[in-house]
Amino acid sequence: MQRIILIIIGWLAVVLGTLGVVLPVLPTTPFILLAAWCFARSSPRFHAWLLYRSWFGSYLRFWQKHHAMPRGVKPRAILLILLTFAISLWFVQMPWVRIMLLVILACLLFYMWRIPVIDEKQEKH
């Protein structure tokens, strides 16, 4: 029963993480890490799919090995975060929603700032 629950949570996390790529309020990284954790404990097949076949695979393998982001990925991720939040702030009219978005943005940027980076060239040596 626990295995089935972990698989369901894992797939739910994959869906939410994928939606998080385009929706600024949903963070991608924590959901994909949750999916990897769930699949590692419940399904070697789904875990292998996530690590080697999915769009997130190379980033997950890098995170699993180094607990860091590749140097070039971090600025692109931050730029995408800023762009999606700017679009949201442009369309939202309610002040309390704008404030909420700005607070979420600040927390997300702080989280991103704290993630260590490593050069991919340095990693290969």
UniProtKB/Swiss-Prot annotation:
The chain crosses the membrane at residues 7-26, 46-63, 75-92, 96-118. Residues 1-6, 64-74, 119-125 are cytoplasmic. One of its GO terms (cellular component) is plasma membrane. It is a multi-pass membrane protein. The lineage of its organism: Bacteria, Pseudomonadati, Pseudomonadota, Gammaproteobacteria, Enterobacterales. Its main location: membrane. It is found in: Cell inner membrane. This is Inner membrane protein YbaN. It comes from the Bacteria.
